Structure formats: structure tokens, C-alpha cells
Swiss-Prot record:
Family in the record: Belongs to the TtcA family.
Subunit structure: Homodimer.
Binding locations of [4Fe-4S] cluster: 176, 179, 267
Biological role: Catalyzes the ATP-dependent 2-thiolation of cytidine in position 32 of tRNA, to form 2-thiocytidine (s(2)C32). The sulfur atoms are provided by the cysteine/cysteine desulfurase (IscS) system.
Biological source species: Psychrobacter cryohalolentis (strain ATCC BAA-1226 / DSM 17306 / VKM B-2378 / K5)
Cofactor note: Binds 1 [4Fe-4S] cluster per subunit. The cluster is chelated by three Cys residues, the fourth Fe has a free coordination site that may bind a sulfur atom transferred from the persulfide of IscS.
Compartments where located: Cytoplasm
Name of the protein described by the UniProt record: tRNA-cytidine(32) 2-sulfurtransferase
Swiss-Prot/TrEMBL keywords: 4Fe-4S, ATP-binding, Cytoplasm, Iron, Iron-sulfur, Magnesium, Metal-binding, Nucleotide-binding, RNA-binding, Transferase, tRNA processing, tRNA-binding
Length: 381
């Protein structure tokens, strides 16, 4: 059973997606009618999940009685569900190891995944894992107390990566890269040790955008954090279920839930972090142009290799003309030729003809399914 099943209720819908022979992962290939049918199924599946979630929340405390909170939780649950479905993140029988740092993102991820586990018609297990990196002043009792109070199965790993990072990173350089590599290596090994099939990280949409611009501005590469990643040794699968979620929604959700947040003193003690500068830029854009970040994130899912300059992604060398034998004249009023002798020397016409509108070519183009677009030069987003 795949991730798509996670969002298909165990009821017989009026419309069966499988009966239409089109690719559900590429909605731009569908007709308007087909898309309406898909949207109808997705809406009814979401409604089913909403009903299950409402039943669960009916017995909870006053916090969930807030209409605003429940709307926000529904929004996050749907966005996480869509990300899991779109990238086939969680399948039946998976053991999902949720990495919990004590920050707002990982708390929110764990909370939403636990809700989905209760209402999904497939079975998957969740285990929370925290890596205590022995940073000075780290309140090591906070996370275990919270996880025990919530009845969440968990492991607390202790490894002094802090001392290693401090010893190998030169003074004045940022710790983030070295810290991340050490942490990732430890979590990879432990996931394999306990048999976890997926490692869930709390990176959200804005993290992915910030990483995109960090690589663009400082790494000379068009790349970001993928929603799903197979490790280089093919031993572990990373997933980012918050890929569609905005940070401001996570902040609000975390505040409403009153998670016991643990700040990262190692990161917070550093100044002039490039990621912090990028995050400030993104926030300014979002304030001034509310749809800009959504447009950029959409662009990350709509890559056109032929319109870039990466020779590995697109074969520019073997591009060749494929013209027909029909002579097509310039449709205009006049053509003025200059340096006629030079034109003649290279075999070009010295007095090319013009023509008025040619209905034959117009009729031929009507059969083309390619949309007619007005060319845009240097569009401003």
C-alpha cells in the first residue's frame, strides 16, 4: 500500500481515480474536466480525514475547542497529507523515526504525524528520537518529560558532538555545516540499528526556500532540500513532511500548543549567519509581496531544463533544425537589405519577398496543441 492510500478513505467513492488513464503526479497534463474529477476525490478524501480528526479532537481539552486552532490544525494536517501523498513519503508498515530537537518545527511535525497515524487507514509506527549533543546548559530533562507525558515512544541518544564541532571549526567560521553532518551521521546509523524505514525531519517550506537561495548566492548551484531523499549509501530514506507548510503557521501552532521549546545555544550564539540573512530577505519579500514565496516554491516544482544552461540536464549539443519544405515568407510590409554585396557573397537573398497574412500557415497552426504565448523578455517576479 502506497502513500496515496494514506489519503484514500476505506469507502467506495463515486468516482474511481484509477479509471482515468493519466498521470496523477502531473496535474498539468490533465484536462479541465479530469482535474475537476480529481479535485472532487481529493476534497472528499480530505473531508473524510477531517471527520476522523474531529472525532478524535472531540474529547480533548479546551485548546482544541478554539475554532481558530482547529482551522489551523486542519490546514497543517492537509498540507502534510498532501506532501506525503505527492512524494510517497509514508507507506503501509513503515517505521517513521521523527527527529525531535526541541524546536517548534520538530514538535509540530511530531504532533501532526501522530494525528495522521490515528486517522489513516494504513498502519505505520512512529518513534521519536532526540540527539543530546552535550551543549553547555542544555536542559536534558525537558524532552523526556514531554514525550513521557504524551505517551510517545522515544529514544534519547547522547553523543558529545559539541566538543568535536568546537575543536574542528576554525574561530570565526559557522558551526552549522559540521554540526549537521555529525548529527546526520549519528541519526543514520541509529535508524538502521532500530529498523526505522523513514527518517522524518522538521524542515518546512521556508527552510527549503532559504537553502535554495543559499546555494544560488553562495554555492553557484540551483538546488535545495528535497522533500524526499535517499542517502548516498542507499541505506536510509529522509522525508520532510512539512515541505508545504509555512514557518509562520508553525510558529502560531507551536505557540497555541505551548510546546516546551529548547533553543539551540550553539546556533544562536553565532553572528552574521548567511542563512539568517537569507531568512530576513524572505520575510521582507513576504511582507511586501505576499505571493512571491509561493511563486518561487512553485517554480522549484516546475523546472524547465531546456530553458537553463546545465549541459548535464539537457542535451544542447545535438539540437538540430527540423524544417519542412514549405517556404514561409516574412509577413510584413517591407524588407530593407543592407550591404547587398556581402549578403550575396554568403548566399543570402538580396531582395527577400514579403507576404500578407497567409491562411494556409494559420490553418496548419490550428492543429498544433502547443499554446500560443506572447514572448516575455526578462520577466519580473
Amino acid at each position: 500500500m502506497t502513500a496515496a492510500t494514506l489519503f484514500t478513505p476505506s469507502i467506495t467513492p463515486q468516482f474511481d481515480k484509477a479509471s482515468i488513464d493519466i498521470d496523477v503526479n502531473h496535474h498539468d497534463k490533465t484536462t479541465d474536466i479530469e482535474q475537476m474529477l480529481y479535485d472532487d476525490v481529493d476534497d472528499r478524501n480530505d473531508d473524510f480525514m477531517d471527520e476522523q480528526a474531529d472525532n478524535i479532537l472531540a474529547d480533548t481539552q479546551s485548546l482544541t475547542e478554539s475554532v481558530h486552532f482547529r482551522k489551523l490544525q486542519k490546514k497543517l494536517r492537509r498540507q502534510v497529507s498532501w506532501a506525503i501523498r505527492d512524494f510517497n513519503m509514508i507507506e503501509d508498515g513503515d517505521v517513521v523515526m521523527v527527529c525531535v530537537s526541541g524546536g517548534k518545527d520538530s514538535y509540530t511535525l511530531l504532533d501532526i504525524l501522530l494525528l495522521l497515524k490515528r486517522i489513516a487507514p494504513i498502519h505505520f509506527d512512529i518513534v521519536a528520537v532526540n540527539l543530546d549533543q552535550k551543549q553547555p546548559g542544555y536542559p536534558e530533562e525537558v524532552l523526556p518529560a514531554y514525550l513521557n507525558e504524551q505517551g510517545i515512544a522515544h529514544y534519547i541518544l547522547e553523543k558529545d558532538t559539541y566538543s568535536i564541532v568546537k575543536s574542528v571549526v576554525p574561530e570565526g567560521k559557522t558551526y552549522c555545516s559540521a554540526c549537521s553532518r555529525l548529527r546526520r551521521g549519528s541519526l543514520y546509523g541509529f535508524a538502521k540499528q532500530i529498523g526505522a524505514t523513514k527518517i522524518a525531519l522538521g524542515h518546512h517550506r521556508d527552510d527549503m526556500l532559504a537553502t535554495f537561495f543559499l546555494n544560488l548566492f553562495h554555492g553557484g548551484a540551483l538546488k535545495s532540500m528535497p522533500p524526499k531523499l535517499l542517502s548516498d549509501d542507499k541505506q536510509n530514506m529522509l522525508i520532510r513532511p512539512l515541505a508545504y507548510v509555512e514557518e509562520k503557521d508553525i510558529i502560531e501552532y507551536s505557540n497555541l500548543k505551548e510546546f516546551p521549546i529548547i533553543p539551540c545555544n550553539l546556533c544562536g550564539s553565532q553572528t552574521n549567519l548567511q542563512r539568517a540573512i537569507i531568512n530576513d530577505m524572505l520575510r521582507e519579500w513576504d511582507d511586501a509581496h505576499p505571493q512571491r514565496l509561493a511563486s518561487i516554491f512553485k517554480a522549484m516544482q516546475n523546472v524547465a531544463p531546456s530553458q537553463l544552461a546545465d549541459r548535464e540536464l539537457f542535451d544542447f549539443e545535438t539540437l538540430s533544425l527540423d524544417r519542412d519544405d514549405n517556404e514561409r515568407l516574412f509577413e510584413g510590409d517591407n524588407i530593407q537589405a543592407g550591404q547587398i554585396e556581402s549578403l550575396a557573397e554568403i548566399g543570402l537573398p538580396v531582395s527577400p519577398e514579403t507576404q500578407i497574412f497567409n491562411p494556409d500557415f494559420a490553418n496548419a497552426e490550428k492543429g498544433s496543441r502547443a499554446p500560443k504565448k506572447i514572448p516575455t523578455i526578462n520577466p519580473v517576479i
